[in-house]
Amino acid sequence: MHINNWPTHERPREKLLAHGAATLSDAELLAIFLGSGLRGHDAVQTARNLLHTHGPLRELLDRPPGDLMRLPGLGLARACKLTAALELSTRHLAAALQRGASIHDPISAGRYFAQRLRANPNEVFAVLFLDNRHRAISFEELFHGTINGAEVHPREVVRRALTLNAAAVIVGHNHPSGNREPSPADQMITQRLKNALDLIDVRLVDHFVIGDGAPVSFAEHGWL
């Protein structure tokens, strides 16, 4: 059945307009981008097949344009459009966190960490330094590790905070495995980092763990 023959409340575009993009599944969002499906399949079916065969979503979207264009249902034009859309999203988040921008939306900060770190094949620990009005000073990838972890040194974060005259920091790191649940080591280093920053009166605002799906916020879970 063609999507136009679906009940109105089940159509992806109508659902997006009525309830917002966040309420749609990965397949529904991808279907809106595709616009139409392959012969004999509507856009949602085509999107589901793409995700089932070439997903999950992160792996699909991390592919370079040359790989995307060879996937059924995409082709050159859609592969280029999808890559451009992802880059626009990255630049939109970067603009919101540019130097001097006030950080009042932790969700946007988490998304920015995700955009910067998620595709790394190895673990990376990054810090966003803020002034006393929570304006961005600098985003820095301070520690790089292996697929299994990155060694984090709180004293280096403290040194950079003092150099930049930061009043607060947001930190984040990726889990290359895609598992976004914080490990005991993540919990331990967060507490060590918080204690070290407290000594110089710099606030640890949040720690994001980046994997598949939405970033996990330590602050949101009351772990700080």
UniProtKB/Swiss-Prot annotation:
Q: Does the keyword Zinc apply?
A: yes
Q: Is this entry keyworded Lyase?
A: no
Residues that bind Zn(2+), according to the entry?
Answer: 173, 175, 186
Residues of the MPN domain: 102-224
Alphabetically ordered keywords of this record? Hydrolase, Metal-binding, Metalloprotease, Protease, Zinc
Q: Which InterPro entries match?
A: MPN (IPR037518), RadC_JAB (IPR025657), RuvA_2-like (IPR010994), UPF0758 (IPR001405), UPF0758_CS (IPR020891), UPF0758_N (IPR046778)
GO BP: any one term: proteolysis
Q: Where are the transmembrane segments?
A: none
Its protein name is: UPF0758 protein PD_0117
